């Protein structure tokens, strides 16, 4: 019976040449007879090894062998990925449009196991997930910027390390739209702008002290906001490299900020400070329109709550418990101004170990004028709930894409997941998950941003969020590590 030929004639010739090429340096003078015999067996003329039909490639056999191993590993990885996807499909429901969505994806939180850990040589001060690529970025106390590839097997070597600043990097942020520019700010008083390939393209100078935090406008890649220990809030044009506006928002060190954009009124800036307060400002005019006062220590960070789910839960809670909020006019909860503004509630975290949830009074709107301080409650926000559970400073916050989970990181070395819907059941925002894994203070956390998408209707928003969610969550700590949670 004729033996089945697996290789073509050309492939067979290439393999024979590669075998002789591999054995030549191994066969010393004493073994040249053996090499000649093998060459004759394989029909190879050593004097004409470099034939017209076969191109000689150095270390050909070794390279082919390593390629096979890499391909085998890739096949195993793909088989595992297919298995995971099949598991997801098997546990899904189909919506009316035939789009298959995971039952639990919209409420995904980490189980608590560390999927991957990345170690730096210095304290990790800030972390950020790339908005599109499988990359983890972190800044360190020594000014180094690290870029790690989640898909790499070797988690000991970063994809890239950049000496970005001369002192600690305090915050990293990406633009909200493509191309994804990166900005970093530092205790060296500067802000640096980087292109999509992490090449430095510009340095922004203007702050007179530590630059604490930065964030891009959600609607304009050219606009960047920053806050500093010099108490100033600055608005930058990153392409021109100039400061467009500067205004003082606080009496002490300005720690953090969050930005939300309104189609009608432009950007609003929420800031917090060592003066134990937070402030809402209209970006274009610099006017303060609302204040948040109630913490007993430094306010470390602030976040707007997205309208998705949060507004409905909190409106219902206030309506059912009017005796607890006698100064909140119920008609205010239905004020359509909030729809135009894009914000209604926010959260703050402090060194008093608490997180507080606030209803922001809407600014006064007058024709042909920028928004003015609110006429409600002397422009003071109403405290709706206090989240207690951390035993030390709460320094980082993020909001789950579903809009109802709040995530916090603390100096007590824990990360907590809070469920707003607990207000309707128990009257409290309950902790639904606490994850522990760091040996030092939690300095920063980040949940993967939703994939970019076109505008969708309100009723389709939850489905769109579920489809666009990336189930990735990271944390950075004073123990010099970044952890990607499973």
Swiss-Prot record:
The keyword Cytoplasm belongs to this UniProt entry's keyword annotation: yes
Keyword NAD included in the entry's annotation: no
Pfam hit, one: WD40
One example GO MF annotation: dynein complex binding
Gene Ontology annotations for the cellular component aspect, listed alphabetically: cytoplasmic microtubule; kinetochore; microtubule associated complex; nuclear envelope; spindle pole
SMART domains cross-referenced by the UniProt entry: WD40
SUPFAM superfamilies per the UniProt record, alphabetical: Lissencephaly-1 protein (Lis-1, PAF-AH alpha) N-terminal domain, WD40 repeat-like
Localization per Swiss-Prot or TrEMBL: Cytoplasm, Cytoskeleton; Cytoplasm, Cytoskeleton, Spindle pole
PROSITE patterns found in the cross-reference section: WD_REPEATS_1, WD_REPEATS_2, WD_REPEATS_REGION
TM spans (from-to): none
CDD domains referenced in this protein's UniProt entry, alphabetically: WD40
Any one biological process term the GO annotation gives: microtubule sliding
InterPro entries the record matches: Dynein_regulator_LIS1, G-protein_beta_WD-40_rep, LIS1_N, WD40/YVTN_repeat-like_dom_sf, WD40_repeat_CS, WD40_repeat_dom_sf, WD40_rpt, WD_LIS1/nudF_dynein_reg
Keyword line: Cell cycle, Cell division, Coiled coil, Cytoplasm, Cytoskeleton, Microtubule, Mitosis, Repeat, Transport, WD repeat
Subunit annotation: Self-associates. Interacts with NDL1 and dynein.
Chain's role: Positively regulates the activity of the minus-end directed microtubule motor protein dynein. Plays a central role in positioning the mitotic spindle at the bud neck during cell division. Targets cytoplasmic dynein to microtubule plus ends, thereby promoting dynein-mediated microtubule sliding along the bud cortex and consequently the movement of the mitotic spindle to the bud neck.
Protein name: Nuclear distribution protein PAC1
Gene name of this polypeptide: PAC1
């Amino acid at each position: 019976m004729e033996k089945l030929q697996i290789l073509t004639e050309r492939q067979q010739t290439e393999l024979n040449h590669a075998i002789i090429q591999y054995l030549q340096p191994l066969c010393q003078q004493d073994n040249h007879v053996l090499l000649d015999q093998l060459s004759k067996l394989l029909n190879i003329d050593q004097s004409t090894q470099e034939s017209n039909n076969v191109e000689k490639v150095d270390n050909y056999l070794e390279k082919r062998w390593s390629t096979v191993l890499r391909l085998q590993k890739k096949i195993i990885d793909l088989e595992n990925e297919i298995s995971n996807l099949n598991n997801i499909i098997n546990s899904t429901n189909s919506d009316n449009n035939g789009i298959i969505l995971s039952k639990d994806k919209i409420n995904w939180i980490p189980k608590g196991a560390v999927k991957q850990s990345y170690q730096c040589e210095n304290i990790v001060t800030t972390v950020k997930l790339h908005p599109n690529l499988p990359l983890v970025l972190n800044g360190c106390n020594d000014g180094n910027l690290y870029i790690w590839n989640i898909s790499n097997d070797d988690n000991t070597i970063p994809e890239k390390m950049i000496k970005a600043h001369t002192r600690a990097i305090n915050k990293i942020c990406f633009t909200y739209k493509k191309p994804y520019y990166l900005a970093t700010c530092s205790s060296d008083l500067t802000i640096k702008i980087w292109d999509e390939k992490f090449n430095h393209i510009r340095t922004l100078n203007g702050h007179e002290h530590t630059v604490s935090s930065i964030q891009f406008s959600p609607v304009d890649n050219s606009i960047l906001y920053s806050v500093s220990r010099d108490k100033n809030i600055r608005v930058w044009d990153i392409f021109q490299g100039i400061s467009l506006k500067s205004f003082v928002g606080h009496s002490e060190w300005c720690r953090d900020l969050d930005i939300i954009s309104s189609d009608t009124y432009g950007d609003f800036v929420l800031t917090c400070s060592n003066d134990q307060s937070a402030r809402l400002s209209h970006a274009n005019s610099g006017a303060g329109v609302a204040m948040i006062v109630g913490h007993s220590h430094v306010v470390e960070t602030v976040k707007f709550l997205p309208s998705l789910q949060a507004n409905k839960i909190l409106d219902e809670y206030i309506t059912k418990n009017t005796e607890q909020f006698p100064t909140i006019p119920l008609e205010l909860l239905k004020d359509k101004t909030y729809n135009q503004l894009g914000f209604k509630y926010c959260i703050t975290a402090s060194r008093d170990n608490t997180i507080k949830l606030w209803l922001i009074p809407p600014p006064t709107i007058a024709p042909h004028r920028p928004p003015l301080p609110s006429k409600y409650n002397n422009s003071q926000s109403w405290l709706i709930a206090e989240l207690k559970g951390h035993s030390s400073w709460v320094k980082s916050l993020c909001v789950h894409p579903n809009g109802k989970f709040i995530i916090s990181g603390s100096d007590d070395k824990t990360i907590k997941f809070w469920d707003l819907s607990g207000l309707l059941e128990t009257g409290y925002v309950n902790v639904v998950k606490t994850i522990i894994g760091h040996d030092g203070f939690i300095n920063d956390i980040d949940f993967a941003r939703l994939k970019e998408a076109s505008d969708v209707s309100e009723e389709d928003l939850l489905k769109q969020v579920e489809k666009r969610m990336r189930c990735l969550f990271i944390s950075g700590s004073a123990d010099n590590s970044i952890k990607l949670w499973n």
